[in-house]
UniProtKB/Swiss-Prot annotation:
PROSITE patterns: CRAL_TRIO (PS50191). This is Alpha-tocopherol transfer protein-like. One of its GO terms (molecular function) is phosphatidylinositol bisphosphate binding. Residues 117-282 form the CRAL-TRIO domain.
Length: 342
């Protein structure tokens, strides 16, 4: 008798196994977990993610989308839906609302989200307005460095900066590591003038914060502000009313005290511009990462989509994205708040 037939005879068939002996069904080939054992443990402890229930949870969210929003044009891939479950600690209802908000925000602010691709933002990327540091912090968070002083308002509108921020966040959130660990923002306000600050008025502030808090699947663990001038008090006065208490408590204002910054972000991961030992600030590497992702962004953000009203309705938009009339964003109104700092 052949080796093959011996194997067939001696191997137990599925039918001969009792129910308790049946092997667990294999995970679909569409998703392969890339988390390390430590991150699996962290996700379990902080996000209530149980590996043995992961695909069941994804399927539950997928079923909810199909039932409650059958016409929603969205990816239903395991990896994509996991972003929203992790961002809302595997609460199905909150994850569904976040997913709906995510698409509502994209469709309600076309100036930012239409044609969102790296090649359309080469001027912003070349300016050095933002980058991602090459090293993560001790908690594994990527550090997004934003430098408003690099922006020249006469070159392009502030919405281009916002587009670059969301482009970066979209790229970062593709990583399961980032989905679990979150990100840290390092904002350097050195040299920000009154005229430049006035472009970031209440309406834009409310829209940006509304998306970050309620319309994007990312965990912001801390915002470190350095070199802020006196004018920043006015900027923060504009921002703070729209911040949830949890996020507001994660803002740290260091001024020019880099020692204070180093108690939160070690010098070993910071460039020398911020008293670190990781060399000069490099923006070219992250720009190259984004530009190499051009095809992914074209596929995701440069295709025609139905309007927000026809599928989701304005009532589902996060606060701050429902009506332009909700905030007076005139230059005079903004400057009056900023002048109060002096």
């Amino acid at each position: 008798m052949s080796e093959e037939s011996d194997s067939l005879r001696t191997s137990p068939s599925v039918a001969s196994l009792s129910e308790n002996e049946l092997p667990p069904p294999p995970e679909p080939p569409g998703y392969v977990c890339s988390l390390t054992e430590d991150l699996v443990t962290k996700a379990r402890e902080e996000l209530q993610e149980k590996p043995e229930w992961r695909l069941r949870d994804v399927q539950a969210l997928r079923d909810m989308v199909r039932k409650e929003y059958p016409n929603l044009s969205t990816s239903l891939d395991d990896a994509f839906l996991l972003r929203f479950l992790r961002a809302r600690k595997f609460d199905y209802d909150r994850a569904l609302q976040l997913l709906v908000n995510y698409h509502s925000c994209r469709r309600s602010w076309p100036e930012v989200f239409n044609n969102l691709k790296p090649s359309a933002l080469k001027d912003v990327l070349a300016s050095g307005f933002l980058t991602v540091l090459p090293h993560t912090d001790p908690r594994g968070c990527h550090v997004v460095c934003i430098r408003p002083d690099r922006w020249i308002p006469s070159n392009y509108p502030i919405t281009e900066n916002i587009r670059a921020i969301y482009l970066t966040l979209e790229k970062l959130i593709q990583s399961e590591e980032t989905q679990v660990n979150g990100i840290v923002i390092l904002a350097d306000y050195k040299g920000v003038s009154l005229s430049k600050a006035s472009h970031f008025g209440p309406f834009i502030a409310k829209k940006v914060i509304g998306i970050l808090q309620d319309g994007f699947p990312i965990r912001i663990k801390a915002v470190h502000v350095v070199n802020e001038p006196r004018i920043f008090k006015g900027i923060f006065a504009i921002i703070k009313p729209f911040l949830k208490e949890k996020i507001a408590n994660r803002f740290f204002l260091h001024g020019s005290d880099l020692n204070s910054l180093h108690t939160n972000l070690p010098r070993s991961i910071l460039p020398k511009e911020y008293g670190g030992t990781a060399g000069e600030l490099d923006t070219a590497t992250w720009n190259a990462v984004l530009l190499a992702s051009e095809d992914d962004f074209v596929k995701e953000f440069c295709q025609p989509v139905p309007t927000c009203d026809s599928i989701l309705g304005q009532t589902l938009l996060p606060e701050g994205l429902t009506s332009d009339a909700q905030c007076d964003d005139s230059l005079r109104a903004v400057k009056s708040q900023l002048y109060s700092c002096y």
